[in-house]
Amino acid sequence: DGISLLPYFAVQKELEESDNDRLSGELVPIISRDQFDDEAEKFLTRYCPEALDKPMRVPIETIASDMKLQVIEDVPLSDNLTYFGTIIFDNGNVLDKHRKITIRNAKRGTVYLDPRVSYERSVGTKRTTLAHECFHWHRHQPYHVLMKMIGADDNLGKAIQCQIAANSMDSDKWKAVEWMEWQAKDVAPRILMPAKMTRMKANQLLATYGGVDDASITAYENVIDELAELFDVSRQAAKVRLMDLGYSKAEGAYPFVDGQYVRGYSFEAGALGKNQTFTIPYADLFKAYCFDREFKKLIDSGQFVFTDRHLVLNNEKYIARNQAGNATLSEYALTHMDECCVVFSKGYSYQSKYQGVKYYTQFMRNAAPVENQVEYS
């Protein structure tokens, strides 16, 4: 077939314009987690600089068009919504892991968004997926050109299929495609909610409720909803972004676990460290009970009750009963979680060459309907 030089020249242009020329041997950008906000800012500087001057809805659909990407939303990408989106780097058929053709005659520069994303998840989730694919196009073309030039098999030179579930494998076992997915997954929400503008708007809104430290959990939920509407992202994306930016009280707003919201809660400032929480899915609690001997002893002692997806001291000050007679958190407990609840650390695995520095990598336990479901310890 011969190799088209168009992708090669596009890659040359990208490398010349990029001020981060740190690439792995496979031409994957070397980006550490603490550089993600900078990556998002560079993307917006190039494609939508006005989004760095005022809090606004980032027109990611227009950006995709300006990047000469064609967006198609009428092709299901998997049987069970395993993939939200796919971006095509070279013409041809796209195969799944069983070598079954999922997209025929795909064209370079095409983004496929599964049509079920909007109505089974949210429009905000669709926008995050599109930002994810745009970042792939912006930063990950060199790898795909290399794969084509060396004659790599399967999809490696053609497409990235973007799964909703983060990779649960240890990061030191990740392949290049998995590192590119990690980069795009974490940069995408930062593109839609750039750090400086999100802080500006969040502080402005929280000031009407007494400020960052004094605002109630209800106030934080109102602010999250206003940010979600302004930036046109999902509620959970807005919450997670606030937490990323250091608004720790947002942890207690709109807790979503095991497919449902539980009641919001508050706690003393400083009670939770980074990547800590009072909320844990039932499956993760059960896993800890089965595999951690000391934790099993703690549960078996009867000192704690698992209710509302929190592990709470078994004391009438903190435990109330609902009309059905089931244990639930008391109103006092909901405003003093640091007094009565076990703190869980979100699970991490370590390192890799694609980050450039030793850094921890966040994982999700399974396919989740929200952007921040993780494994706990």
Which residue stretches match the model-derived regions?
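Active-site hotspot residues in diverse enzymes, especially metal/ion-binding acidic/histidine motifs
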Residues: 1-377
